[in-house]
Amino acid sequence: MSRMLPSMVPGVVRDAEGKARSDDVAYEFLAFKLGSETYALPLAGVQEILKPPRITRVPRASHEILGIVSVRGRVTTVIDLRRRLRVPEGPIDKNTRVLLVEAGNEVLGMLVDAVLQVYRLYEDEVELASAVGGDMNEYVMGIGRPRAVRTLGRSTSQDRSDPNDILILLHAEPLLRR
């Protein structure tokens, strides 16, 4: 399966006693909210998380493009991830963030409702998109079902995640295509 998750960065995995395990590979994802769903992108592609800066609208841009922003002198396009993924519109509030994401040679901003946390997932915690189905397969890598929240590389009984936690794992490159 690791060949099917090429954009992830393997990390050191530790067992319940904190000892490093080399037989498993963990992949890191940044989780965020869009509406009532939790989505995640490979952490390796996320360059920065920003409070929403002033966005300049671009005439005749596609509906999904909110506009452009200047980040340290670099002009960056910002897309509304809700529109791209056909999630109902929502307000921009104090939790809203812009993720600066690199895909290929381009960096684009993605507007999300809130950033949650970084998850480390084992290969057996990921169901590939072919098992998911639907019309969003181009964007969806798969589904993540974390067994436990891993804090500082360790998993403890107090860190158990909700068994109903489901992360919709996204491919960055198709999301950023214009």
Q: Which stretches of residues belong to each language-model region?
A:
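An acidic, low-aromatic, low-complexity terminal/linker signal
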Residues: M1-R178
